[in-house]
Amino acid sequence: MQVDLLSSAQSAHALHLFHQHSPLVHCMTNDVVQTFTANTLLALGASPAMVIETEEASQFAAIASALLINVGTLTQPRVQAMSAAVEQATRSQTPWTLDPVAVGALDYRRRFCVELLSHKPTAIRGNASEIMALAGVANGGRGVDTTDAAANAIPAAQTLARETGAIVVVTGEVDYVTDGHRIVGIHGGNPLMTKVVGTGCALSAVVAACCALPGDTLENIASACHWMKQAGERAVARSEGPGSFVPHFLDALWQLAQEVQA
């Protein structure tokens, strides 16, 4: 199994495209991470919109550059709104990304996510346990936390990618991005990133935005993982703990985006 690495030049090019196109991302995400997710997108140069009302979700999915579906705080009204948005995104050819939070631990959301797969997401982003559960390989995970190493989920990610046509991202100490054939590994980051709520969910929003960019979608998505890991490393160097990490992380994302424009 060959795992390719992303070059700094590829990452910088994708970030330049990101800033140039400034995708409008329709984020149907969970209650815990909305502010952090929006600020992450803004720091990189995208435009977030948190539209969750069923009557509006379908309409907005048609005009957004990309759609994110994150099932972290799932409710029946949100299921209806998310379904409407995904159906409209499919009709409008709006790229959409699925973040199957805790899908390995809870049956209701697993069934819902499996139903959504029939609408062919552009990308799927989850930890190892979530990706393996969604692929039908195993059920597991401790709530939103993974109990599996990312590398162990690569075969499941490849299968899921081939079956759905999505680019699948497995995040962990090393992130892996695959279209079912190619695999790109992204190293870096810091364990402190797991002590802050929302870094993975925010990454899913950035992945969604990258699906709207021109060029190689797999490389663009892998670049999103790289930016987040880079920013995490920079932020940790300036932080004293989780509380000071968040503002430094947002600053680091902003600085990365400014550097490619210089």
Curated annotation (Swiss-Prot):
It catalyses: 5-(2-hydroxyethyl)-4-methylthiazole + ATP = 4-methyl-5-(2-phosphooxyethyl)-thiazole + ADP + H(+). Pathway: Cofactor biosynthesis; thiamine diphosphate biosynthesis; 4-methyl-5-(2-phosphoethyl)-thiazole from 5-(2-hydroxyethyl)-4-methylthiazole: step 1/1. Disulfide bonds: none annotated. InterPro entries: Hyethyz_kinase, Ribokinase-like. Its EC number is 2.7.1.50. Its cofactor is Mg(2+). Substrate binds at residues 50, 198. It comes from the Bacteria. The keyword rRNA-binding does not apply. Keywords: ATP-binding, Kinase, Magnesium, Metal-binding, Nucleotide-binding, Thiamine biosynthesis, Transferase. GO terms for biological process: thiamine biosynthetic process; thiamine diphosphate biosynthetic process. Gene3D superfamilies: 3.40.1190.20. GO terms for molecular function: ATP binding; hydroxyethylthiazole kinase activity; magnesium ion binding. ATP binds at residues 125, 171. Belongs to the Thz kinase family. Catalyzes the phosphorylation of the hydroxyl group of 4-methyl-5-beta-hydroxyethylthiazole (THZ). This is Hydroxyethylthiazole kinase. The gene is thiM.
